[in-house]
């Protein structure tokens, strides 16, 4: 059964901490099934005292069309093969097809949201701009997943601007 949720605010639902999901349905924009960790696996990787911490095994994403929201949790281990797999979790065609099931004569709001390692990005627009919204969403997803937060954090915490560390190693 598809995870379609009724609600007034797609962004609020896209930022929810625990996602459960089922296998894909015919109206879903997603091509991959939900890969949410089991409860035991979730507890192994999370500190229960810090409810704002993301599970390090993957990321959350959602597509919302009006009041209907489709959510997915996808596993991502930051390898090239994993990146290629999750970038194909939806396409412009699959989003257009799913969205067309909810379009009437009026324009509806469409929202894409992704959350990875504490960073959330939400892109929204009207149904008439869905193609542009898809392009912005895939670009945002690709940039967010290709960031190396550990490397950036280590340079910032040492007070070194990016690239300084490389120069010091070469001059030794």
UniProtKB/Swiss-Prot annotation:
The keyword RNA-binding applies. InterPro entries: Tombusvirus_p19, VP19_sf. Residues 1-38 are annotated as: Disordered. Keywords: Host-virus interaction, Inhibition of host innate immune response by virus, RNA-binding, Suppressor of RNA silencing, Viral immunoevasion. The keyword RNA-binding applies. Homodimer. This is RNA silencing suppressor p19.
